[in-house]
């Protein structure tokens, strides 16, 4: 059910976002406690504001009401992915070269399943990161297929 809701929501929201020159970052349909949430994360170059989120929310809500794909009650949330934006697509990695990222792996590489460091390069199949171990800089090459989750990492 969850994947059906996500794919249908993607079909409904994509034309809205294209018209407004916005990017779909992610869609989640999750149950938290006794409530269901349909979360749509959108963005654009330079960031998105609350007015744009509100406009997309209203338009998407109308489309969802028309097609009525969700049987249970739910809350629709449209928002920015935040500063620690998830990296979901290969294009996200391309756009994040030179940025600090956090990567969680399905299986360890060099004894670790988590890396945080600077994304040096991405060739479509391999992520190359530079990270620190104490004061030494090291480099790791991670096959894209082994990445479970990745996101921008903010450092202070």
From Swiss-Prot:
Its main location: cytoplasm. Keywords: Cytoplasm, Ribosome biogenesis. The keyword Ubl conjugation does not apply. It is found in: Cytoplasm. Signal peptide: none annotated. GO terms for biological process: ribosomal small subunit assembly; translation. Disulfide bonds: none annotated. Pfam families: DUF150_C (PF17384), RimP_N (PF02576). One of its GO terms (cellular component) is cytosol. Belongs to the RimP family. Required for maturation of 30S ribosomal subunits. This is Ribosome maturation factor RimP. It comes from Oceanobacillus iheyensis (strain DSM 14371 / CIP 107618 / JCM 11309 / KCTC 3954 / HTE831).
């Amino acid at each position: 059910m969850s994947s059906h809701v996500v794919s249908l929501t993607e079909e409904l929201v994509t034309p809205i976002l294209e018209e407004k020159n916005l990017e779909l970052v992610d869609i989640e349909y999750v149950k938290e406690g006794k409530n269901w949430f349909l979360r749509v994360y959108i963005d654009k170059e330079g960031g998105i504001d609350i007015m744009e989120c509100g406009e997309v929310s209203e338009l998407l809500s109308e489309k969802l009401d028309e097609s009525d794909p969700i049987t249970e009650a739910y809350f629709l949330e449209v928002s920015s992915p935040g500063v620690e934006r998830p990296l979901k697509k290969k294009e996200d990695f391309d756009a994040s070269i030179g940025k600090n990222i956090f990567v969680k792996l399905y299986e360890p590489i060099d004894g670790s399943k988590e890396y945080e460091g600077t994304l040096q390069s991405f060739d479509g199949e391999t992520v190359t990161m530079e990270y620190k171990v104490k004061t030494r800089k090291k480099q790791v090459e991670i096959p894209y297929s082994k990445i479970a989750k990745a996101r921008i990492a903010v450092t202070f």
